[in-house]
Amino acid sequence: MDNYAFMLAQQWINKIPAETALPLQQQLDKLPNDKISSLGFLPLKDPVIGLVLGLFLGHFGADRFYKGDIGLGILKIILGVLGIVFFIVFFAVGASMSNSINGDSHFLVAFFLGLLALLAPSIWVIADWFFVWKGIKRDNFKKITEYLSMLGARDLRETR
């Protein structure tokens, strides 16, 4: 394997799906050096950045915006805001009903409904830790294969 092709494959190893690394290295071996050198400037996204964004700003859709899924990022923002609004509304309604007979039980029911509305979008946020991680790697591999096909290499997508 050419030294530059090997370095390039090692640079991409954590940015593409694991099952595609070997076929990609084999394809890079077949390319001439002048074509391989242009691959070094291919902008790939880092799945670790997507994960960190999901961990800290997942309710605001930052991981989806980073991945390029703008529509899903906006939907995550809307659901997160709705969860907060419903929590505040249920909490306020429960607090106002706490002065009536059986008020404490009404407050608890309203509080737990509000808490449920606040935590429901969290299920999607947690699932997105995995979906965005895998999706970024798939998108990177797709970008590499499209660029390789522009360079005249055989299509690697059939190896998956």
PLM feature spans:
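Transmembrane helix recognition focused on a "late"/terminal membrane span
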Residues: M1-L51, I77-R160
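A short amphipathic helical element positioned immediately N-terminal to and/or at the very start
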Residues: V52-F65
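Short loop/turn motifs that initiate or flank beta-strands
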Residues: G73-L75
